[in-house]
Amino acid sequence: MVQVKNEGIILQATNLPFENEAVLNPTCIEANGITHMFYRAVRKGDFVSSIGYCQIDEGGKIINRLDHPLLIPEYDFEKEGMEDPRVVFLDGIYYFFYTGYDGKNALIAYATSKDLVHFEKHGIISAQFTYDEAEDLFRQSKALEKYQFFESVLKDRVGEDVFLWEKDAFIFPKKFNGKFALVHRVLPGIQVAYFNSFSELNDSYWRKYFMELDKYIILDPKYEIESRNIGGGAVPIETEDGWLLIYHAVEDSKYGKIYHASAALLNRDDPTQVIGRLRAPLFSPKEEWEKKGKVNNV
């Protein structure tokens, strides 16, 4: 059994207007001996999210924290929030992925930086078609039955014309046969998309991709702890035995949704080949501050 030490809370909301409601869902990367943390900062009132930033020392102590957001919503597709950041360093560039939320649609967007200070936004890279359109494409793959449930959930909750929801995106910190490998999450599983350039990720690319979706599934829910859905967590870590993927597993229980942390080991040359995955969670909500919050049982 894997033992995980709970280090407690390291970052909390402040009285600053951009993060006075909550701070959550961070991503970290080490550079020049410093751990850089980018996190979702939520403000009170309209609950719009921006991206906050701080630095952490080896002991887990905050040594520097901005008193203003590093990145803010600027475009219509992100007007209700920039959420769930992930940062990856590859070939001299920091790739920064996030979910752009416009009040209805949740779509993958990205930015780039060379210094983790100045970022250039490049816009949406995920598919922009409705669940009705996606269903027609899923019919041509073997993925329809597993993915159809969430079509009805989101259409009922958000609206008939909602786009295919995308979250939890990042690239592997290494190319495969010269191609980027983008991990993303169309409910309920985790998938990967390969491409030479981000400019390829257009409507034509995604329509062909979803017609063959079953070829690109890394993980689908399998065990009781992930009975509802799963989604990518930290950027994969390359080991001698394969890629270590930490992901969140959502259990449907009589108490509602429970978010667990889990892990899988993926083939170093083909991440759709799963070497092994945990049946029991790495860790689960135990402390009161994990069971009660802006989202419970996380």
Each model region followed by its residue ranges:
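Catalytic cores of histone-lysine modification enzymes
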Residues: 233
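Beta-rich carbohydrate-recognition and catalytic domains
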Residues: 1-21, 27-80, 89-228, 237-297
